Amino acid sequence: MSTHVRHPIWLPALRPADARTFASLYAVESFARATISSVIPIQAYEILHNEQIVSILYTIVSLLGLSVTLFMPMLIRRFARRWVYTAGCLMLAIGSVFFVTHTLPGQLAGMCRVMGASALSITLNLYIMDHIRKTDFMQAESLRMAWSMFAWTGGPTLGIFLYTRFGIYAANGAVVAFALPLLALFWTYRLGDNPSIRPGKSRPINPLANIGRFVAQPRLRLAWLIAFGRSCFWTTFFVYGPLFM
């Protein structure tokens, strides 16, 4: 009797992506972003010694991030979502490497991690729309915001603690410690595009062509104003709070 028997290899079966899947991804991502959010303005002020120049630096980086966000659909069509998400995780980690140089060019390059955050946000929202049913969307978003609350509540405090007690390497090392597990978690979930959703045959090449259609709809304008106002508040809080405390 033959003793060489090939037994089947049992691959781990993953359950379909649900609300907890995206809540866990967003929570780890939030920790990677929130931990350093309160340290960046302090480090920029230590380099520039002027609050106004720090504001100008943030404005320049924000405009660069906005330009990349507008062209993110082109990148997704060219390289696929999973690779754009992967690039976003790596940009968070690489940005921290630039921060530890404690120089103005390194600060500017590190703050460009906002492009990675944009890639993560857009691709994650696309995955959510593919895998979460419309009837479950409210519950999924509530769970996602609730889990990220822990990151944005404790993350900035953790970053300041590490920066003041253990130095710049510890604060930025925490970002890498969250960004790399985020990448591993994403590939563990094996998220893919919903095969039942097919892209349209005619797609605008220029993303700016859709701005007029967006502005023409009152509900979209209101949603944008709410999101923009909230973003302005929290950005002001995280940037100027550490500077003037």
Residue ranges and their predicted role:
Residues 2-19, 191-226:
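Juxtamembrane intracellular "pre-TM" segments in multi-pass secondary transporters
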Residues 62-70, 152-153:
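Residue-level signature of mid-helix packing/kink "hotspots" within the transmembrane helices
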Residues 113-148:
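Cytoplasmic helix-loop-helix junction between adjacent transmembrane helices
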Residues 171-188:
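Symmetry-related core transmembrane helices of the 12-TM Major Facilitator Superfamily/SLC fold
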